[in-house]
């Protein structure tokens, strides 16, 4: 990759110092960008634990498909998921917004570039730090739909029969008998814990510096049976063999696990569990007297169908994903003379994604018939990927008066 000094870049660029945002507890590093950089839109697409943010550097309007920026971690362009990176591993982030991006990275940077510099040790210093965060998340009452209670819903049904000139079923002749009833929407939610622990160790000597970060993040979802966990580590080491020869290694393994039932989707769909729960009459109880959950519930006075118990369905459905990833980098840099820098590097991105989805017969669709004993569905997939990038560069820079002459030669090979 060719290099340019910050003052030589004529385009728009912003640098975000993560040390100043160390007290902001987030699951994904992109969340720290919210409200920090002018002209960069950072939006949350879903409330599922562990899900990343949508980042738009040049806005959403484009004639081309896709609008995600290019992420470059320690000089290595990342093509896949970038949400596995622990925010506590990052030292700084620089956003290239316009022509500066394409001049360095070509067409891959059509929607901007996010340059990520991970933490490294400073010479002459040894530091050990530990930080922890614990919190509780809830869906605020202001953000919840206003649901009818049992009496209100039964009164509504009674009046609907009367308006149609039909006889009112016995079940709805005395609406007050149902009292408050049961809030199915609230039954699908919970108070969710969030925990974040990180240990950092860095040491710096004259010819050797190293930095190690170990992190554990655990976030329960406010929706039942949803959670996200991530275990990450990063080791950055630099060896100065001589005054003009430097060797560097970066190693970053990550393991993440998430479980999320199909909570999104339209009304009446098998995926919209939460939406379907809002349609369930509040006069029905989602729990038996002995504490167990019935498979289906039936509305009294209505001869039509049985409805699945959504509170049970969301706990019975299994939809989990396990991801393993290793980012590795090794580089050798040589400066034979002042202004001339020769560098060769090998970068690797290796990982796997395992998905397991099981929908038992106890989970069904809105207004569907009672589930069949053989109506279960199972889906499994295991995808592996790898990407190698070998890059050799030669950069020569010389200041002549008020001008700077820069010449760059780049050769790279990518295999994936």
Where do the model's predicted regions map?
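Short, small/polar-rich motifs associated with maturation and membrane association
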Residues: 1-234, 239-254, 327-328, 334
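Surface-exposed loop/interface segments of Gram-negative outer-membrane beta-barrel transport/assembly proteins
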Residues: 122-181, 221-226, 232, 236-325, ...
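An active-site-proximal structural segment forming one wall of the substrate-binding cleft
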Residues: 340
């Amino acid at each position: 990759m060719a290099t340019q000094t910050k003052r030589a870049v004529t385009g728009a660029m912003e640098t975000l110092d993560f040390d100043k945002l160390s007290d902001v507890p987030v699951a994904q590093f992109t969340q720290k960008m919210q409200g920090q950089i002018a002209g960069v839109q950072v939006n949350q697409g879903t409330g599922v634990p562990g899900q990343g943010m949508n980042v738009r550097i040049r806005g959403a309007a484009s004639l081309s498909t896709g609008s995600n920026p290019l992420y470059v971690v320690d000089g290595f362009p990342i093509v896949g998921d970038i949400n596995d990176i622990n925010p506590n591993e990052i030292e700084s982030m620089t956003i290239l917004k316009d022509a500066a991006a394409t001049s360095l990275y070509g067409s891959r940077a059509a929607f901007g570039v996010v340059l990520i510099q991970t933490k490294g040790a400073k010479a002459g210093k040894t530091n050990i730090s530990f930080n922890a965060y614990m919190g509780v998340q809830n869906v605020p009452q202001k953000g919840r739909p206003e649901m009818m209670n049992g009496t209100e819903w039964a009164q509504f049904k009674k009046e609907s029969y009367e308006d149609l000139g039909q006889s009112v079923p016995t079940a709805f002749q005395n609406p007050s008998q149902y009292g408050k009833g049961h809030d199915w929407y609230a039954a699908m939610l919970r108070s969710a814990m969030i925990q974040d622990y990180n240990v950092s160790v860095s040491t710096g000597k004259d010819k050797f510096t190293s930095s190690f970060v170990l992190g554990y993040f655990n976030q329960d979802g406010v929706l039942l049976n949803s959670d996200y966990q991530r275990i990450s580590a990063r080791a950055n080491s630099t060896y100065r063999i001589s005054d003009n020869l430097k060797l560097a290694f970066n190693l970053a393994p990550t393991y993440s696990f998430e479980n999320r039932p199909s909570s999104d989707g339209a009304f009446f769909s098998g995926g919209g569990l939460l939406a379907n729960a809002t349609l369930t009459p509040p006069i029905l109880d989602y729990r038996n007297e002995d504490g167990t959950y019935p498979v289906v519930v039936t509305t009294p006075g209505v001869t039509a169908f049985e409805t699945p118990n959504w509170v049970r369905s969301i706990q019975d459905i299994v939809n989990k994903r396990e991801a393993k990833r290793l980012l590795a980098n090794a580089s050798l840099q040589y400066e034979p003379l002042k202004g001339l820098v020769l560098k060769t590097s090998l970068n690797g991105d290796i990982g796997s994604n395992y998905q397991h989805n099981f929908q038992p017969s106890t989970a069904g669709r809105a207004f569907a018939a009672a589930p069949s004993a053989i109506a279960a569905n199972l889906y499994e997939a295991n995808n592996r990927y790898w990407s190698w990038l070998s890059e050799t560069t030669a950069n020569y820079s010389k200041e002549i008066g008020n001008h700077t002459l820069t010449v760059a030669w780049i050769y790279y090979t990518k295999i994936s």
